[in-house]
Amino acid sequence: MILEGSFLATIVKMSDKLKRVTTPNPAPTSAHDLANDLATAFRGYPAGVAILTTMGAAGPEGLTVSSLASVSAVPAVVSVSLGNGSTTLATLTEESRVIVHMLDADRADLADDFAVPGADHFAGTEWAPSAEGAPRLEMQGPILHGFVQSMTDTGSATLIAVTIDRIEAGNCHAPGLVRMAREWHEIPR
């Protein structure tokens, strides 16, 4: 009983101290400054690199992404954010088939190729249509097959949720590829 009273007394004291702590109001930040600060913060944040591909009416489309995130294991869902000016985004609709190619360090050249807006990303790149019709790049890393579940406009970008229905495990032991400070970096697995 004494322990309970001591514990409760400690909690009450801590609660009183927390009530007295105040947070200063930061100076307002302009939208432009906030956007620059956010870009600077994420420039120093290492992010895995992938290529998202889909088949559009005019042929295969794809781009390099560093915004890939796992959302849910059951059901298997990942997300990616695409700039609203992206030609790949323009071809996507809900239910579109897509493939997410998770890149190993030895494919930084492919990441560079698919990062150029408006370029013919598939010229000189080995690929074939998957069983579902999306462009599958020839590579060794994990490959996630799925379809667009939802698309949410967030301002200058669109957040895309992709339901994964098939995975090629690939080589999970090769060094990984991350993007940080506008450069590719190899990391051991």
Show the residue positions of the predicted features.
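Basic, polyanion-binding surface patches
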Residues: 2-189
